[in-house]
Amino acid sequence: MKKYIIYIFVSFFIIPIHSQEDLWDVIRENSNFQYSADRSEIQKALKIYQNNQYLVDRLSKNGQRYLYHMFDVTLKRYKPVELALLPFVESQFDPYAQSPAGASGIWQFILSTAREQGLKRNWWYDGRRDIIASTTSALNYLDSMHRKTNDWMLAIASFNVGPARIQREVKKNKNQGKQTDFWSLKLPKETSKY
């Protein structure tokens, strides 16, 4: 109980004192993903964020309470720090976000995946909305998908569209003699943007 109270105190009172820009600098310095900034998809996304400073500011503010924890956990688990930014896309760092498809929480787990990942749910508690539990489950899930695909981009795509779809598309491309990387797969538009 003491640990939990200390965590709440640090999360709400001490961490916000540190500059959000400092954390963004640390994330940039620890970035692991290799990608081509020349890709039209990336240029389009960059332009959206560059032209909508209000959106970036709002997302940064929403993430202020949670991003440090997610970043810290990814570093401690030796995972790419970019994984800590997925809630930026999933829920805009809103632990109470609810999708029309029933996904919930900061990581937007659907109920079946949440159950598979051991997140509890009852009449008063939903583990999908628990920052610590859902972050642990999300990173476990992503790690599992990475072990299957050996590719972080495909692991992230699996998080969005499900592993069966990724496996099906990889198999289809292999059978056709095509590349099996993220950019070569035919994926739903939402997943491609993701």
Predicted regions span which residues?
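An acidic, Gly/Ser/Thr/Pro-rich helix-cap/linker signature
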Residues: 1, 15-78, 83
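Short alpha-helical patches at coil-to-helix transitions and adjacent helical residues
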Residues: 3, 63-67, 103, 131-135, ...
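Short, functionally critical alpha-helical segments immediately adjacent to catalytic or ligand/cofactor-binding
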Residues: 79-96, 155-160
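Solvent-exposed loop/turn segments at secondary-structure junctions
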Residues: 91-94, 113-116, 162-165
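Substrate-binding/active-site groove segments that recognize
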Residues: 101-124, 135-142
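Contiguous mid-protein beta-loop-alpha structural module that forms a pocket-lining wall or clamp
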Residues: 124, 133-193
